[in-house]
Amino acid sequence: MNASAHKKRLSMMPGTSSASRPSMAGLPQRNNPPPQREPATPAVSELMRSSRRSMAFGRNPRQSSFGLVPQTPMAPMHTRDPRPVRDRHYQQQISQQIYEYLVTNHFEQETRHPLNQRTLSNPTQKDFKTMFEWIFRRIDPGYPFHKSIENEVHAVLRAAKYPWLDSITKSQIVAVGGQSWAYFSGMLHWMVELNTTIEKYHNHDYSGDDGPSLVDEIFNRHARESYFAYLQGDDRFARPDAELCLAEENAEFQEILAEQRAQNPLPEGEDDELDEELSRLEAKWGKIEEAKLLGKNLADDIVKLGAFVDARKEHNARYASQMSQATAEEDNVTSEVESLSRQKLKLQQTIQDQGLSPAELDKLHLDMERQQKALNSLDEIIDEGRQVVSNKESTALAVFDALDRVIKEYTSSVLSYNAWVASDNDLPEIPESVYLIDLREPLSEENLGRHPSVILGGVDPRNQIRPEIVRICNMVTSKVKALQEEALRLQEEIETNQEKLVSQKRHIGELEAKSRRLRETRNALEDSASMNENENSQNTERLENQFVQAQSETALAQSQLKGLQVRLQDAEHERNKLSVEVQQARERLSQDILKQAEVMVAFKAMVQTKLQDFEMFVRANVEEEIRGDHN
C-alpha cells in the first residue's frame, strides 16, 4: 500500500484534522446498500454495510470511544465456524496469506517486532498481541488499547461482530498456542480479509464487478463528506464550492449518459416513428375516454328511465284498483237506498192502517225523546258515581300497597340490624313489638271508623316505635364513636410501624451498599489474583468473610423487614375492615331509621285523614241514596 493510501487511515484523535478511516464501534448500522465487490465472508459483508462509521457520539472530533463508553448489549453468537481451521493445509494457506499481508504493509518497520514463518506457526503471547493490535488499528486507527489482552480481544471482536466468537475463550487468550492457535489464526485471517476488502472499497477497486451506479457513487461521496464534517462538529454541512461540484457531477453524468447512448444507439428514424406512434395512440386514447364517459352517462339515463317507467306502471295499477273499489261501493250505496225506500213505504202503510194522525205521531216522538234524555242523564249520573267510587277505591288500594311496602322495608331493615348486632353484645336488638306491625285488612267493613292503633294491631308508632328507635340510634352513634377512636389508635400504630419500616429499609440499603462495595472489591481482587494468587489469598479470604457477614446481616434485616411488613398489612387490613363497617353501619342505620320513623308518623296522619274522608264520603252517599228512595 502506498504512502498516500496510508495517510488516509489516520486516527480520529481530538485535534486531528483528518477525517479518513474513522472508528466504527459504538454506532448502529444503517441500511445503505453496499457497493458491488469481490466475495468476502458473511461477517465482512455485514461489517462493510456499516461503511466504516465512527464510534464518536459527540460533535467535536475525537478518538475511538470503544472501551470508554458502555457498549450496546448484544445477543450471544452461537454460530459454528464452518471453516476447516484444524486442517493443516488450510492452516498453512491462511498463515501464508497473513504473512504476505504483514510483510506487504511493513509490519516489522512500524512495530519494530521481528516477523517470520515461525511467528505464525508457533507464536508467543507478545507476538499475538503485537499482530492483533497492529491489524485492528488498521481497521480502527483511533482505538486505544488500555485493558489486558484477554479482555481487549473479546471486547474488540464483539464490537467488530466476529461471527465465531464462541470458539475463543478468555482462558485461551491468556495462553495462545497449542491446540487453540488454529482458531486464533482463523480470527487473524478474518481481520486481514476485512482490511483487504475495506481497502478495495476505498480505492474503488471492484475486481471486475460493475460496482455502484453513478447515482449511488455521487450520493455515497456526498454522504461521506457530510459525515466527516459532522465528526468535526459541523452540524450544517455546506460546501463553499457546492455549485462547482454540482456542475462537475452534472457534466460527469452527461458524459456517462452520452457513452451509454453511443453504446446502445437507436436505428435512424426509429425515434421519430415511435413519437408519431405515441401521439396517435394518445389521440385514440382520448377518444376512448370520451366514449367511456358517454357510455357511462347513457347507462345512467337508462337506469333512470327504467325506474320512471316502473313507477308509472305501479301508479296506473293502483288507480285501476281504486276505480274498481269505488264502483263496488257505489253499487252497494244504490242497493241500500232502494231498500230504505221500500221500508219507508211499508212503515207509512202500517201507520195509515193503525189510524194514527201525523200530530199524534209527532207527540209520541217528543215523549219518547224526552224519556230517552232522562234515561241518558240518569245513566251519566250513575256512571259518574261509579267512576268516583272506582277512583277512590284505586286510590285507597294504592295507598295501602305503598303502606305495605313501607312496612316490609322497615321490617327488613330491622331484621338486618338484628342480624348485624347478633355478634356484638354492646348493641341491643330491636324487640319484635317494635317492628312487628299487622294491618289486619284496614279497608274491610269491620275496620271502618276504628282508631289507627287498633288497625295496626295495637301498635302506636309515635309513642312506642319512635322512642325505641331514637334510643337505639343513640347507642349506635356511641358505638360508632368508639370504633372511630379505635381506628385512630390503629392509625397511630401503623404510622409507628411505618417509621420502623423506613429505618429498617435504610439500614438494609446501607448493608446492600456495603455488600456491593465488598463484592466490587472482591471482583477486583479476583481479577488481579489470576496474576498473583499466592500473594492476595489471605486478603481474599478476609473479604469473603466480611461479605458472608454482610450477607447474614442483610438476611437478618430482610427477615425483620418481612415481619414488620406482615404486621403492617394486618394492621391496615383491620383498619380498613373497621372503617368499612363503621361507615356502613352509620349510613345505613342513620338513614333507614330516621326515614322509617318519618314515614310511619306521616303514614299515621295520612291514614287517619283518608279514613275520615272516606267515612264522610260513604255517609254522604248513603244519605243521598236514602233521600232518593224517599222521593
UniProtKB/Swiss-Prot annotation:
Give the location in the cell.
Nucleus; Chromosome, Centromere, Kinetochore
What Pfam families has UniProt attached to this entry?
Ndc80_HEC (PF03801)
Any single GO CC term annotated in Swiss-Prot or TrEMBL for this entry? nucleus
Q: Residue spans with biased composition (Basic residues)? A: 1-10
- Is Ribosomal protein one of the keywords? no
Gene Ontology BP, a term: mitotic sister chromatid biorientation
Task: List each coiled-coil range.
Answer: 321-387, 473-592
Q: Which InterPro entries match?
A: Kinetochore_Ndc80, Ndc80_CH, Ndc80_sf
Q: Which UniProt keywords apply?
A: Cell cycle, Cell division, Centromere, Chromosome, Coiled coil, Kinetochore, Mitosis, Nucleus
**What GO annotations for molecular function exist for this entry?**
microtubule binding
The record's principal subcellular location, in a coarse class, is: nucleus
- Tell me the segments the record calls region Disordered: 1-84
Q: Which cysteines are joined by disulfide bonds?
A: none
Protein's UniProt keywords contain Zinc-finger: no
User: How is this protein organized at the quaternary level?
Assistant: Component of the NDC80 complex, which consists of NDC80, NUF2, SPC24 and SPC25.
Q: What does this protein do?
A: Acts as a component of the essential kinetochore-associated NDC80 complex, which is required for chromosome segregation and spindle checkpoint activity.
According to its UniProt record, which protein family does this protein belong to?
A: Belongs to the NDC80/HEC1 family.
What is the name of the protein in this document? Probable kinetochore protein NDC80
